Swiss-Prot record:
It comes from the Bacteria. It catalyses: L-lysyl-[protein] + 3 S-adenosyl-L-methionine = N(6),N(6),N(6)-trimethyl-L-lysyl-[protein] + 3 S-adenosyl-L-homocysteine + 3 H(+). Disulfide bonds: none annotated. It comes from Listeria monocytogenes serotype 4b (strain CLIP80459). One of its GO terms (biological process) is methylation. This is Ribosomal protein L11 methyltransferase.
């Protein structure tokens, strides 16, 4: 088989939106080369340091590589893919020194290239995300989430995902009922299940995302707790007594449904909203307040913000 590699040079803030666009166009795998990953401390709790090479990383920004079967349909779609990526700037997503290049690669190269950039990520002192092909020995009481990031719908390495998992770790109580809006890889649903949630509804509008979520949920043996549904946000979801709603999606999308979140939550229920670029945080905060939610706190990692709000006790 012939494969094409789409290489995009952009900013860290644009990683997840760009990766999601590429996957929606049919990418079979995505790798992310971020110089910040090389520069930050990579020592784990066993004193091991991952052997990463500086030459594998860009001088600045992020390089995202996506792999497509080189079909006639793909070749015809190349201009549309490039334009869709450029259009992300209309959502105030900074693309930086945007570059878009298409190369041919052999079958073996695309299948393994991205694996060297993805290693276990310790999110909290309790939760670690581990790629499915790596052997990892957890410590006592450590929660392990296994992911195959080939579909690139949230690998746990992005700040927005980490902010959500930390908030879930802080607020989720055993026996809680959770809705995960825009589930992507299913990582937040899996984290919720392993933190003790009784039942979780994971929704995503994208069919590819729901398939990726189902595969990862099965990998983590949490399918008896998590139900995956292809759905547009909370549309036609009639739950009204939910403990936690979590959404790791763009601010512009969060603004579409705060009233629906309020209706879904029970009194005292928590809404964890991430995927919010710093410049949009105030707008989202005001929309949540207008819907009747009370802001509990805001957490920030880099340029990304998570807002934790609550439905008041009536």
């Amino acid at each position: 088989m012939e494969w094409s590699e789409v290489e995009v040079h952009t900013t860290n803030e644009a990683v997840e939106p760009v990766a999601n666009v590429l996957t929606e166009f049919g990418a079979a795998g995505v790798s992310i080369e971020d110089v910040a990953d090389f520069l930050r401390e990579r020592e784990d709790k066993f004193g091991e340091i991952y052997a990463l090479r500086r030459e594998d990383y860009p001088e600045d920004g992020v390089i995202i590589k996506a792999y497509f079967l080189k079909t006639t349909e793909f070749v015809e779609q190349i201009p549309e893919i490039e334009q869709t990526l450029k259009n992300l700037s209309t959502f105030d997503i900074p693309l930086g020194n945007f570059q878009f290049v298409v190369n041919d690669v052999d079958d073996e190269e695309w299948a393994t290239a991205w694996k060297k950039y993805y290693h276990p990520v310790q999110i909290t002192d309790r939760i670690t995300i581990v790629p499915s092909w790596e052997s990892y020995t957890p410590s006592a009481n450590e929660i392990i989430i296994e992911l195959d990031p080939g579909m690139a719908f949230g690998t746990g390495t992005h700040p927005t995902t980490q902010l959500c998992i930390r908030a879930l770790s802080d607020y989720l109580q055993p026996g809680d009922e959770v809705i995960d809006v825009g589930t992507g890889s299913g990582v937040l649903s899996i984290a919720s299940a392993k933190l003790g949630a009784k039942s979780i509804l994971a929704t995503d509008l994208d069919e590819i995302a729901t398939r990726a979520a189902e595969e990862n949920i099965t990998l983590n043996k949490t399918e008896h707790i998590i139900t995956v549904k292809q759905n547009n946000l909370l549309q036609d979801i009639n739950k009204t007594d939910v403990d936690i709603v979590v959404a790791n999606i763009l601010a512009e999308v969060i603004l579409l449904f705060p009233e629906d979140v309020y209706r879904a939550l029970k009194p005292g229920g928590i809404f964890i909203a991430s995927g919010i670029i710093e410049d949009k945080a105030k707008v989202v905060e005001e929309a949540l307040k207008k819907a009747g939610l009370v802001i509990e706190k805001m957490e920030q990692q880099g340029d990304w913000v998570a807002i934790i709000s609550k439905r008041g006790v009536e």
